[in-house]
A protein has these predicted regions:
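Short coil/turn segments that connect the beta-strands within blades of beta-propeller domains
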Residues: 2-3, 54-56, 99-100, 154-155, ...
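Conserved beta-strand positions in repeat-built beta-propeller and related beta-rich domains
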Residues: 7-11, 15-16, 60-64, 104-108, ...
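Beta-rich catalytic cores
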Residues: 18, 44-47, 91, 146, ...
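Short loop/turn segments immediately following beta-strands, especially the blade-tip
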Residues: 25-32, 71-78, 115-124, 171-177, ...
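Conserved beta-strand position repeated across blades of beta-propeller domains
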Residues: 41, 50, 96, 151, ...
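Asp-box/WD-like beta-propeller blade repeats and closely related beta-sheet repeat scaffolds
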Residues: 79-149
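Surface-exposed loop and turn segments in beta-propeller and other repeat-based domains
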Residues: 127-142, 224-232, 276-278, 329-340
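Loop/turn-rich, solvent-exposed surfaces of beta-rich toroidal or solenoidal domains
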Residues: 235-302
Length: 340
């Protein structure tokens, strides 16, 4: 059985808008082999993608100074633009789609932007922009707010801010969201990047002081902190995600360029580090696919941004170690998204 992936990219050796775009790659579900990478549409700096829950619309940010987000209608023939909107902020780096709303994190300006969505997945009205203020102790990376990632936690939308060491909460409403205060504060200088909700806890990967924090969803208290990898050296976590059955947590770590695997137990309060699997340079993002046919091994496809390669790993359930089973060259991949 063959599936496919959408892949967003960064500019490859040139300024934003110089030819980068959205690619599609085939993946063999029985082996993990990757093939037939092709550029589907050229669009500036599509560093992050999101798919509408119905699968009929794909959204791509343009991570440029005057940020935009574009909606594309998905068809067997490719992608057709439905419209482009300004995000009202700079350097949008993450986008999340629900049935009736689109959420964007603007890294450069620290803003969180919301859009209402029409039935066809296109935009329904202009942006609603929520600003933020503050800073952290790192003068180079925390001189101001830097919204980085958006996730659904319970019935709220949470936004991580790498610049202020905060997770902010918002309550969705038709066409937008209402600010609801600070969900959690991480240790000063930690730099929260991506997070995932698991039951009653939220697990956060911090980029500046590399670590994995487990937070109580209700009290925001830090329940546990784990090293992000066994390796030593420059550690810079990028993305984290669960296996389909919730039994394992994967964390991509740049610098040492590994995919770390943790076993999840006791409602994610306990994470046991199992293994670090070498990948290509600059693992910025990855997608966790259903297990390879006939096995219980996870299939993880990693976007090795600096190596300009997609790497598919077969990750053993018991040991957490990954074995490369496929790769394909692709210019500066930044985001991997399973197609439907």
């Amino acid at each position: 059985m063959t599936g496919s992936l959408w892949v967003g990219t960064y500019p490859d050796g040139g300024p934003a808008g110089s030819g980068e775009g959205i690619w599609r790659v085939r993946v063999d579900a029985s082996t993990g082999e990757l093939s037939a990478a092709r550029l589907v549409v050229e669009t500036p700096a599509p560093s992050f993608l999101a798919l509408h829950p119905r699968g009929h619309t794909l959204y791509a940010v343009a991570e440029v100074d005057k940020g935009t987000v574009t909606a594309f209608a998905v068809s067997p023939d490719g992608l057709a633009p439905l419209g482009t909107q300004a995000t009202g902020g700079a350097l949008p780096c993450h986008v999340l789609a629900t049935a009736d709303a689109l959420y964007v994190a603007n890294y450069g300006s620290g803003d969180f932007t919301t859009f209402g969505l029409a039935a066809d997945g296109g935009f329904a009205g202009g942006p609603e922009v929520h600003g933020n203020s503050g800073s952290g102790p790192d003068p180079e990376r925390q001189e101001g707010p830097h919204a980085h990632y958006i996730g659904i936690v319970g019935d709220e939308v949470w936004v991580s801010d790498l610049g202020t060491d905060e997770l902010r909460r918002y309550r969705p409403r038709p066409g937008g969201a209402s600010a609801a205060g600070i969900a959690a504060r991480l240790p000063a200088g930690a730099g929260p990047r991506h997070f995932v909700a698991i039951g009653d806890v939220v697990v956060v990967a911090t980029e500046l002081v590399a670590g994995v924090y487990v937070l109580d969803h209700q009290t925001a208290a830090v329940v546990a902190r784990h090293d992000v990898a066994a390796a030593r050296g420059h550690l810079q976590p990028s993305h984290l995600a669960l296996s389909p059955d919730g039994s394992h947590l994967f964390v991509a770590v740049r610098g040492v360029d590994v995919l770390s695997t943790f076993a999840v137990s006791a409602g994610a309060v306990r994470l046991e580090h199992l293994a670090d699997t070498p990948v290509g340079r600059g693992p910025r993002h990855f997608a966790v696919l259903p297990p390879i046919a006939g096995t219980d091994a996870a299939l993880v496809v990693v976007a090795d941004q600096q190596a300009s390669t997609l790497t598919a790993l077969r990750v053993d359930r018991e040991t957490g170690s990954g074995t490369p089973v496929g790769s394909v060259p692709l210019p500066a991949p930044a985001c991997v998204l399973p197609a439907r």
